[in-house]
């Protein structure tokens, strides 16, 4: 296996893991970075693998919590509510994704759309942060979330179907806008990523499994492990960060990155295939 290809697969896995749980759009970063370093492996299969690696980082980080929930379902009220909230939050985006997946990829998966959503999302984060700084959040614990709170976060997640919006960005900001404390909204976003990304991965596997070849196994494993490790680091770091600070730095980053995408696209440095 060529060392340069291995290095590129490693870098792509790291990009996925570090950006998946930050409100900065992992999709945009993977496309731009993949173009810049010339990574042209079996794209969709590789993407599925690194997304799975990233989501398993959340499962590992919260393994005790998920274990308690699994053992408590049907017996423990707190576990039942947790599962119910995840199910409620999961449904809106899952339904809309199944209904409009083809149209979204056909009409919205382009550099202009992604760049615009990055910039608009950046300004939206600035507005939400300014709003929360003026009002005391009503909910400061994941276990205190009600089904209606989960539904509002789920509705917000629908916007993440538009490339460039960011799943974590839409769910966290949607939660904060609804009156949920920043760290609590972030944690619930992590939890919601598990069923959402597992379902998306399963859907993509059914669509693209025929493109898998044994030749890709090595690169897939490298990307998977890199995404898992970097995702674990990102989850820990983000929780620590939002415990003391806000999301404003990410807002400015999004705005700049959106402009960079337009420049790179117009200059021919990146393609969108």
UniProtKB/Swiss-Prot annotation:
User: Pfam families, from UniProt?
Assistant: BacA (PF02673)
Highest taxon of the lineage: Bacteria
Stretches that traverse the bilayer: 13-35, 45-62, 82-102, 108-128, 186-206, 219-239, 250-270
Work out whether the entry's keyword set contains Electron transport: no
Q: Which GO terms describe its molecular function?
A: undecaprenyl-diphosphatase activity
Q: Which UniProt keywords apply?
A: Antibiotic resistance, Cell inner membrane, Cell membrane, Cell shape, Cell wall biogenesis/degradation, Hydrolase, Membrane, Peptidoglycan synthesis, Transmembrane, Transmembrane helix
Q: Which GO terms describe its cellular component?
A: plasma membrane
Q: Could you tell me the membrane topology recorded for this protein? A: Multi-pass membrane protein
Enzymatic reactions: di-trans,octa-cis-undecaprenyl diphosphate + H2O = di-trans,octa-cis-undecaprenyl phosphate + phosphate + H(+)
Q: Where in the cell is it found?
A: Cell inner membrane
Principal location class: membrane
Q: EC number(s) in its UniProt entry? A: 3.6.1.27
What GO biological process term is on the record, naming one? peptidoglycan biosynthetic process
- Other notes: Bacitracin is thought to be involved in the inhibition of peptidoglycan synthesis by sequestering undecaprenyl diphosphate, thereby reducing the pool of lipid carrier available.
What does the function comment of this entry state?
A: Catalyzes the dephosphorylation of undecaprenyl diphosphate (UPP). Confers resistance to bacitracin.
State the family named in the UniProt similarity comment for this chain.
Answer: Belongs to the UppP family.
Protein name, please?
A: Undecaprenyl-diphosphatase
The species this protein belongs to is Neisseria gonorrhoeae (strain ATCC 700825 / FA 1090)
Gene encoding this polypeptide?
A: uppP
């Amino acid at each position: 296996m060529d060392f340069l290809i291995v290095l590129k697969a490693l870098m792509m896995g790291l990009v996925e893991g570090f950006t998946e749980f930050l409100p900065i759009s992992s999709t945009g970063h993977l496309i731009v970075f993949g173009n810049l370093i010339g990574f042209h492996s079996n794209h969709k299969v590789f993407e599925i693998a690194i997304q799975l690696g990233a989501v398993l980082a959340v499962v590992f980080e919260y393994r005790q919590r998920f274990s308690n929930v699994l053992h408590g379902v049907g017996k423990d009220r707190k576990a039942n509510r947790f599962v119910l909230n995840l199910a409620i939050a999961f449904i809106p985006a899952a339904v809309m994704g199944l209904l409009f997946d083809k149209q979204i990829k056909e009409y919205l998966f382009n550099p202009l759309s992604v760049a615009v959503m990055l910039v608009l999302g950046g300004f939206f984060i600035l507005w939400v942060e300014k709003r929360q700084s003026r009002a005391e959040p009503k909910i400061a614990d994941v276990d205190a979330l009600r089904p209606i709170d989960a539904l509002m976060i789920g509705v917000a997640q629908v916007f993440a179907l538009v490339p460039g919006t960011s799943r974590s960005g839409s769910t966290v900001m949607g939660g904060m806008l609804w009156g949920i404390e920043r760290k609590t909204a972030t944690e619930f976003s992590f939890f919601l990523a598990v069923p959402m990304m597992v379902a998306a991965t399963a859907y993509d596997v059914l669509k693209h499994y025929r493109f898998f070849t044994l030749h890709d196994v090595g690169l897939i494993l490298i990307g998977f492990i890199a995404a898992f490790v970097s995702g674990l680091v990102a989850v820990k770091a983000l929780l620590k960060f939002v415990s003391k600070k806000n999301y404003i730095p990410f807002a400015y980053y999004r705005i700049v990155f959106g402009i960079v995408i337009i420049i790179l696209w117009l200059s021919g440095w990146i393609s969108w295939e």
